UniProtKB/Swiss-Prot annotation:
Residue pairs linked by disulfide bridges in the UniProt entry: none
Compositionally biased region (Basic and acidic residues): 1-14
Iron-sulfur found in the keyword field: no
UniProt-annotated location(s): Nucleus
Name of the protein this chain belongs to: Polycomb protein eed
PANTHER family (UniProt xref): POLYCOMB PROTEIN
Stretches forming WD repeats: 93-136, 148-187, 190-230, 236-277, 306-343, 361-401, 410-443
Gene designation: eed
Keyword Transcription regulation: yes
Length: 443
């Protein structure tokens, strides 16, 4: 089924006027975007092996005080056990950068593999089928032509089990789409500027985290339409927040941004647990008082010793952190010393322990985000010239991580984000030239 549906205007304003585009750093002026799949290329290059030496950057010169690292220098990537083949590609007809892509990991076994892309004022849903087919399901267009969606995240309705997709971008408005009823069912206005990333809580499908250009993070309850907490202020981020992630238990948030910092925020405090419980109990029809959102001004840990530039992507890997900047490396690290329990880290802790680096090349522009598969066994990142790097994370020591480089002569535009299907059989990459690339894992 194909469709295009306009999303209605919200009943409130998002605050100050916001830029309508992210920094566009790579494009193909001669492209003729369409939605027809390209012919499969049997001559796909799947290169594995050692990467060339990476030039020195401020992050691999002298170590910051309190830093500790396993081993010396860099490690060489050996042949990775994972192999992929590009089986299909297509271009969306708006021709603008696609900033985000996410598979729906909440689907049941046997259901079609559905993923969403966001870019320009468009949200598009696709199904992956056998023989490399990518089938267009639905396309939603925002009523404001100046909207530019940057991020999306999947959850589900607890009462109906319908999959829900949250999207947001330059206007700072969060929209919730039910693709079964084909409607934008909710929207949230609160941030004073663009929203750069959305994440749902790993154990509570109603808790949505948003991070913004207004220097703050917000935690929402989409079941009761309440703003649970605002993270920022006195000791919060000093510039645009670019990324954040929940740990697997949903007890901690790590955020990062343009101020080069990474900050840890705990959700398991009595104050926040009480606020979350209160958000479920709040009923506006029974009271005239608005819900009182918690304002969290002080993070539980903060550091600027990992990166020397914008930190544009962060993910938890167990109790470890993976983060990247515009420095051609993803850094694996942990707060405190190696032997420290992360749950006992104090806000004044100044030590960080660097365990390893995943090096790559030609990726020194910002807002390029990596992803992991559901079981956190693979790590994927694209660079600004269309190359994909896939690391095998099933190693005891990050220094022994193995990498595969995926290249295609036709893919030369910046890869903004990647996403694995839940079973890790498919890897999707989206690019600045509105192209979508499907890589199937070879068994």
């Amino acid at each position: 089924m194909k469709m295009r549906r306009k999303m209605s205007e919200p009943h409130g304003e998002a605050g100050n006027e916001m830029p309508n585009k992210k920094q566009k750093l790579s494009s193909d002026e001669n492209s003729n975007p369409d939605l027809s799949g390209d012919d499969n290329d049997d001559a796909v290059s799947v290169e594995s092996g050692t990467h060339p030496e990476r030039p020195d950057t401020p992050t691999n010169t002298a170590s910051a005080p309190g830093r500790k690292s396993w081993g010396k220098g860099k490690w060489k990537s050996k042949k990775c056990k994972y192999s992929f083949k590009c089986v299909n590609s297509l271009k969306e007809d708006h021709g603008q950068p696609l900033f985000g892509v996410q598979f729906n990991w909440h689907s049941k076994e046997g259901d079609p593999l559905v993923f969403a892309t966001v870019g320009s004022n468009r949200v598009t849903l696709y199904e992956c089928h056998s023989q490399g087919e990518i089938r267009l399901l639905q396309s939603y267009v925002d009523a404001d032509a100046d909207e530019n969606f940057y991020t999306c995240a999947w959850t589900f309705d607890c009462s109906s089990s319908h999959p829900l997709l949250a999207v947001a971008g330059s206007r700072g408005i969060i929209r919730i789409i039910n693709h079964i009823t084909m409607q934008c069912v909710k929207h949230y206005v609160g941030h004073g500027n663009a929203i750069n990333e959305l994440k749902f809580h790993p154990r509570d499908p109603n808790l949505l985290l948003s991070v913004s250009k207004d220097h703050a993070l917000r935690l929402w309850n989409i079941q009761t339409d309440t703003l649970v907490a605002i993270f920022g202020g006195v000791e919060g981020h000093r510039d645009e927040v670019l990324s954040a992630d929940f740990d697997l238990l949903g007890e901690k948030i790590m955020s990062c941004g343009m101020d080069h910092s990474l900050k840890l925020w705990r959700l398991d405090s009595e104050r926040l647990q009480r606020a979350i419980r209160g958000s479920y109990e709040y009923n506006p029809s029974k009271t005239n008082r608005p819900f009182v959102s918690q304002k969290i001004h002080f993070p539980d840990f903060s550091t600027r010793d990992i990166h020397r530039n914008y930190v544009d992507c962060v993910r938890w890997l167990g109790d470890l952190i993976l983060s990247k900047s515009c420095e051609n490396a993803i850094v694996c690290w942990k707060p405190g010393r190696m032997e420290d329990d992360i749950d006992r880290i104090k806000p004044n802790e100044s030590n960080v322990t660097i365990l390893g680096r995943f090096d790559y090349s030609q990726c020194d522009i910002w807002y390029m985000r990596f992803s992991m598969d559901f079981w956190q066994k693979m790590l994927a990142l694209g660079n600004q010239v269309g190359k994909l790097y896939v690391w095998d994370l099933e190693v005891e020591d990050p220094h022994k991580a193995k990498c595969t480089t995926l290249t295609l002569p036709r893919c030369t535009s910046a890869i903004r984000q990647t996403s694995f299907s839940r079973d890790s059989s498919i890897l999707i990459a989206v690019c600045d030239d509105a192209s979508i690339w499907r890589w199937d894992r070879l068994r």
